């Protein structure tokens, strides 16, 4: 079950840069191989999915993903897991897939993961479709040269045809919804060091370079982006180069980064883009992301989770690099990028309740329900932020969790514009 759940991490479809324009690193499945389980103890559906081999395992994984902007994507993904010849840890993972979406057609994708040591990973992904394509490579080493220094490198060429834009401001109308295609080539390099040995405080310095091109999207039934927003389209003509330097300081006492049940996380950043660095735009941005997780019992059956996020951009930046509100990792009653402006403030709180624990194939899976509330808005600057444009949301998530790394989640959010449904992996925060 751990391998089946871990495979869900691989199943993410092509996606654009995150709500925070400087991209996060891709999730990489754990290299831990679960202990073998007697065949009679493995449920029948897992015996169909799992096929043990001499040095590894084959998996046949169905894929389903829902998103307000992309609709339903489904398909299959066979996975070949290769163990070390002299041990029981995973050394390589090959994960090709074939998915289908009614708007974007079939998408063949190939994923490859390599683990040179326990705290390092190499990830490669390539995909091609009618309107989209991607080539991505990432290397992450949390103990560079056997020290507490972390090093990360990301290079990506991506074309995402699902992007939406409604205009700038907290009162942008659904009637102005357009679809655009974002094509970009980017690289990200990051180095992190602890303040003191084994400290909860770390500093990260990141260098991000991207070349973006914006064009009309392919989705039918929507006004062309260049027609609805001619000024933004004209400003986005050609490929625009942005070069950003970012300094981040974070504090982290969470028990697990992905399946958190207790602890606190605080991240503060400041970044700037300047023509002296080769960028075509000059701007700066600062922000804060705070999260707290409070367990109400020793078994962590009841956990209250809360998040507050703030960002503010100063100077000139193209619209696709402004703060965007909406989506599973922002405000769960709207699609990605529903609201766009120079600043954003979002708060979320949810009560996680584990209602059932099941042990299958030597792995304990927890099933939880998590009603949530959220409130958020975008603004040009905080001094003119207006309460009437604060967007409240409520809803609930149902999840299957295999700690410490795997979460399968169905999130249903209700807001002022109706219901949004997200089904994929990971917590919202």
Regions flagged by a language model, labelled:
Residues 12-61, 65-68:
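N-terminal periplasmic/intermembrane-space "pro-region" immediately following the signal or transit peptide
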Residues 1-10:
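Bacterial N-terminal signal peptides
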Residues 44-51, 79-86, 114-118, 140-145, ...:
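Outer-membrane beta-barrel proteins
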Residues 60-62, 94-98, 124-126, 151-155, ...:
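Membrane-embedded beta-strand positions of outer-membrane beta-barrel proteins
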Residues 50-59, 65-241, 407, 415-429:
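Gram-negative/organellar outer-membrane beta-barrel architecture
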Residues 58-60, 74-76, 106-110, 133-137, ...:
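Hydrophobic, lipid-facing positions within transmembrane beta-strands of outer-membrane proteins
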Residues 383-429:
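C-terminal beta-signal and terminal closure region of outer-membrane beta-barrel proteins
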Residues 227-238, 242-367, 379:
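C-terminal outer-membrane beta-barrel translocator/porin domains of Gram-negative envelope proteins
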